[in-house]
């Protein structure tokens, strides 16, 4: 005979676990709790013990027969309908007694369970589960969801094992990625390098020096507006560079660059030192867990002080190798081209130490660096292949879009047929413009790729619809629900997706008390008539970044009086919107005490109330001021003046050292010695 637990034996013999444990103690058998295992010897002793106490079958039958007879006799005296109901209740009770439900050894669930569902799985009454939850301090109803910890707590109390089922999504790329690549299949790949740093410290100039080109002059305001990806060859080895904009407004783009990068080059100007965005770049690189190489730029300037840069960076745990640390510092002059070769050698050295590898013999996976809509070519996406090999003709799913790779162009504009790990390529053939930062995956079967792409698009659409319907409800009832809170609606259009994201992120960060920013629509490309119609319906301002409205959009905007703001520099946008938001705010007031008067005598007048004869001790009392009644240093009332008189004449104000008569609106409990403090509310300039 196998061992049995205390609670199982108790259930088998229709007794409570507590009574059984008491009985075992009487028999000098030690048990710690209801989960204790009972061996065969103890079970036999218990069987004998309960057998002696159990009534005989004949006795049970006799008792049962008497009960049945008595019930039958009593039923004769009742109405027929009532008797039938009692009989049904008896039969139901009988079935309940005879039906025994076994407690499961293990239950499974996914996500969460309601109290009712948990009771069903545990073969218990919901009321029993609710009672247990109450004892644990949890007030729950039968339809209330329980979290994983609570489910495990209740199940373990019954000695039942709990297992959570993980639902595998057919739209997640991880579902289709096989297990880790075997070491023998991994090959060396180029390092992906991101250049970061403060504005105007020379990030784009450094990249230009590496690529022997001058891009800086063509950018508006000296800002690198778009993320680009380039590949260079050094000593027969390749290095891939991601060019992330350095301004704080492009935090999202820079963070995305750090997620796909292997090495970060931190550019710090030797004459400026560490600046706010330098620290921000350090934090992004550290969060991504990538090695940092510090390029001390502008060494050709007379004010260059590399030692100060090193000293400042030690505060951020970037200690130079020369000072006993492990951070590589390379002095360079990007504009003169000095130190560039040394910097590239350091990148190759770090790559060699870190051993960056990937498996080229599989279908490609990677990240979207940039995406835009071209009139001639259609959707163009810049992809960084991170694992596997991408080939022309491969079915591909990119974010919520899908298609087949029609053509691939390298960073230097040449058509290529294959792209291995760490290679940036520009592809065409997608059905829609993906989001910058989206993951992509190539498939063997076009039908499967289409199915996954459509499913992902459907999921995104449902989520978007849910979000839109929620926002529209807030629009309808906003004034009722929020009252004084104002809101500014914006539509953001830009030339590329990266700029759209950066602009939206910057605008959402604007913090002006009392006003919210709501971006109701974003998009890539020219401002269209549909954008203007949406702006008109939503009372929104349209912001164009490096784009212009088409002819129809201009005409419609004039008819609908829609405000369109066009910019090429992001900071102009931020400043303009902040100003608009501050203008929309209700004026802010602060209190200013203008005078005090002491109550010298009081007079009670019928139909008027209490008149206080006062002496102005400080400042002045004005007719339109608010007042406080102060008695023994405690404010006992706050309200408005009703009348202010000198002798029998109404006056606008009474100055210091003059007497006056005062009545307070809706207040008559004035006493001699009270202090009347007068104040006004002044508008505060923002």
From Swiss-Prot:
Residues 53-105 are annotated as: Disordered. GTP binds at residues 197-204, 243-247, 297-300. Coiled coil: none annotated. Residues 188-357 form the tr-type G domain. Residues 243-246 are annotated as: G3. Residues 197-204 are annotated as: G1. Residues 297-300 are annotated as: G4. PANTHER family: TR-TYPE G DOMAIN-CONTAINING PROTEIN (PTHR43381:SF5), TRANSLATION INITIATION FACTOR IF-2-RELATED (PTHR43381). Belongs to the TRAFAC class translation factor GTPase superfamily. Classic translation factor GTPase family. IF-2 subfamily. This is Translation initiation factor IF-2. The gene is infB.
């Amino acid at each position: 005979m196998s061992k049995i637990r205390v609670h199982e034996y108790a259930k088998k013999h229709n007794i409570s676990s507590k009574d059984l444990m008491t009985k075992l103690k009487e028999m000098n058998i030690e048990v710690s709790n209801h989960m204790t295992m009972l061996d065969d010897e103890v079970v036999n002793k218990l069987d004998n013990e309960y057998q002696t106490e159990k009534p005989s079958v004949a006795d049970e039958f006799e008792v049962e027969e008497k009960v049945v007879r008595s019930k039958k006799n009593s039923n004769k005296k009742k109405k027929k309908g009532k008797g039938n109901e009692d009989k049904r209740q008896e039969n139901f009770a009988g079935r309940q007694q005879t039906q025994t439900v076994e407690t499961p050894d293990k239950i499974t669930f996914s996500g969460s369970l309601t109290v009712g569902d948990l009771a069903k799985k545990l073969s218990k009454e919901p009321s029993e589960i609710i009672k247990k939850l109450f004892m644990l301090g949890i007030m729950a109803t039968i339809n209330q969801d329980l979290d994983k910890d609570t489910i495990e707590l209740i199940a373990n109390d019954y000695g039942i094992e709990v297992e959570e089922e993980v639902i595998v999504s057919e739209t997640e790329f991880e579902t289709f990625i096989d297990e880790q690549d075997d070491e023998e299949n991994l090959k060396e790949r180029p390092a992906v390098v991101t250049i970061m740093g403060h504005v105007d410290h020379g990030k784009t100039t450094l990249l230009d020096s590496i690529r022997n080109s001058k891009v800086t002059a063509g950018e508006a305001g000296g800002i690198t507006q778009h993320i680009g990806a380039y590949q260079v060859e050094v000593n027969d080895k390749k290095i891939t560079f991601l060019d992330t904009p350095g301004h704080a407004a492009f935090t999202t783009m820079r963070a995305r660059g750090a997620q796909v990068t292997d090495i970060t080059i931190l550019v710090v100007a030797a004459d400026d030192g560490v600046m706010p965005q330098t620290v921000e770049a350090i934090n992004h690189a550290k969060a991504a867990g990538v090695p940092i190489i510090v390029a001390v730029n502008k060494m050709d300037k007379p004010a260059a002080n590399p030692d100060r840069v090193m000293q400042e960076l030690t505060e951020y745990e970037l200690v130079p190798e020369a000072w006993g640390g492990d951070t590589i510092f390379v002095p360079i002059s990007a504009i003169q081209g000095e130190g560039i070769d040394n910097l590239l050698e350091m990148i190759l050295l770090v790559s060699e130490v870190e051993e960056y590898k990937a498996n080229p013999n599989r279908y490609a996976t990677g990240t979207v660096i940039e995406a835009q809509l071209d009139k001639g070519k259609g959707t163009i996406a810049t992809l960084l292949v991170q694992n596997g090999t991408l080939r022309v003709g491969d079915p591909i799913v990119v974010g919520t879009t899908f298609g087949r790779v029609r053509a691939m162009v390298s960073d230097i504009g040449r058509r290529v047929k294959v792209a291995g790990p760490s290679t940036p390529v520009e592809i065409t053939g997608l059905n829609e413009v993906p989001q910058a930062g989206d993951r992509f995956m190539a498939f063997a079967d076009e039908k499967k790729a289409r199915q996954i792409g459509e499913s992902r698009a459907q999921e995104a659409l449902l989520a978007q619809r849910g979000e839109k319907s929620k926002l529209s409800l807030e629009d309808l009832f906003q004034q009722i629900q929020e009252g004084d809170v104002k809101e500014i609606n914006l539509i953001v259009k830009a030339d590329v997706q990266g700029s759209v994201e950066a602009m939206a992120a910057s605008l959402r960060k604007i913090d002006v008390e009392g006003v919210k920013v709501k971006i109701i629509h974003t998009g890539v490309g020219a401002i269209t008539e549909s954008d203007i119609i949406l702006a008109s319906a939503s009372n929104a301002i349209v912001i164009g970044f490096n784009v212009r409205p088409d002819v129809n959009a201009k005409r419609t905007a004039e008819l609908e009086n829609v405000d369109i703001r066009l910019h090429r520099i992001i900071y102009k946008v931020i400043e303009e919107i902040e100003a608009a938001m501050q203008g929309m705010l209700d004026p802010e007031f602060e209190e200013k005490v203008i005078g005090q008067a002491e109550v010298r005598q009081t007079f009670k007048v019928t139909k008027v109330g209490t008149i206080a004869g006062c002496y102005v001790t400080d400042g002045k009392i004005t007719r339109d001021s608010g007042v406080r009644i102060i008695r023994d240093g405690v404010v006992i009332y706050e309200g408005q003046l009703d009348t202010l008189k000198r002798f029998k004449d109404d006056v606008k104000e009474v100055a210091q050292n003059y007497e006056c008569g005062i009545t307070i609106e809706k207040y008559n409990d004035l006493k001699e010695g009270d202090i009347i403090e007068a104040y006004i509310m002044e508008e505060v300039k923002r």
